[in-house]
């Protein structure tokens, strides 16, 4: 899985730095990006899906910020659903972008393609088929609605 891939890549980089032989370092760095992002996004996704993950509409500061940055909660939700609906699968993310000091929705493929540098994920929805197909079949929209 992602943790094993990340750990193996980190070990390769440590060994290469120690020996001075950089053969394989470029592939290991790509593996750190792919497996690290895969691990971090799944970790956030499962935290969001737990009973303590909240559920329902946000309240307080997060709700206020969504309304400020997207115009309304409904506007944010419609855009987030669009991020989750692209045919290639991947991730729909609500992130905080410290450069623009705004919340943004992102559609990210392959864990790290389409990521926004410096953005901090707040909400992650895994829309790869393995996340919904067993329960929802090809109805990704039903999974997103749930």
From Swiss-Prot:
Originating gene: sod2
Catalysed reactions listed for this entry: 2 superoxide + 2 H(+) = H2O2 + O2
Cofactor note text: Binds 1 Mn(2+) ion per subunit.
Cofactor: Mn(2+)
Domain of life: Archaea
Enzyme Commission code: 1.15.1.1
Protein name, entry field: Superoxide dismutase [Mn] 2
Residues at which Mn(2+) binds: 42, 126, 130
Functional note: Destroys superoxide anion radicals which are normally produced within the cells and which are toxic to biological systems.
GO molecular function: metal ion binding; superoxide dismutase activity
Keyword check for Zinc: no
Keywords noted in UniProt: Manganese, Metal-binding, Oxidoreductase
Family stated for the protein in its record: Belongs to the iron/manganese superoxide dismutase family.
